[in-house]
């Protein structure tokens, strides 16, 4: 879950409607069970000029650990490259760092706190590696 127990409004982000933003979803029997959103957004501490931020990745608890998030990212990677970007970054929750490493992300720096959300790590994936 993205923000379990929080209003739906907390899952809406600035940039959701931008032209270069795209949203992916996995459906099982017509029900949306996993989502990922990609934003054309440069991180201030990463030099690569063109970047996408992965934000809002979530899977319903009953559908976690079935490869849905990995599948969404495998769809996202070529779309990002098609938009002439070769780097994706995210602020990974501490408990999700292992997942991101499995799909090729690398950690940068130290864990940091996002208020009300806990410890996170800046992670990047270079699509040309």
Where are these predicted regions, by residue range?
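Conserved acetyl-CoA-binding loop-helix of GNAT-fold acetyltransferases
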Residues: 59, 65-78
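Short hydrophobic/aromatic beta-strand element in the GNAT-like acyltransferase core
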Residues: 10, 21-25, 35, 56, ...
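Short amphipathic alpha-helix that is part of the acyltransferase structural core
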Residues: 1-14, 18-32, 129
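Conserved GNAT acetyl-CoA-binding A-motif
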Residues: 73, 80-92
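Conserved beta-strand in the GNAT
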Residues: 25, 31-42, 53-58
């Amino acid at each position: 879950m993205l923000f379990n127990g929080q209003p739906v409004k907390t899952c809406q982000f600035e940039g959701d409607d931008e032209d270069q933003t795209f949203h992916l979803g996995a459906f099982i029997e017509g029900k949306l069970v996993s989502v990922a959103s990609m934003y054309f957004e440069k991180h201030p501490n990463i030099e690569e000029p063109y970047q996408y931020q992965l934000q809002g990745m979530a899977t319903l608890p009953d559908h976690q650990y079935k490869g849905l998030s990995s599948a969404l990212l495998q769809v996202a990677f070529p779309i990002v490259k098609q938009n002439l970007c070769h780097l994706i970054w995210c602020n990974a929750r501490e408990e999700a760092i292992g997942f991101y490493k499995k799909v090729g992300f690398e950690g940068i720096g130290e864990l940091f706190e996002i208020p009300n959300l806990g410890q996170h790590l800046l992670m990047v994936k270079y699509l040309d590696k």
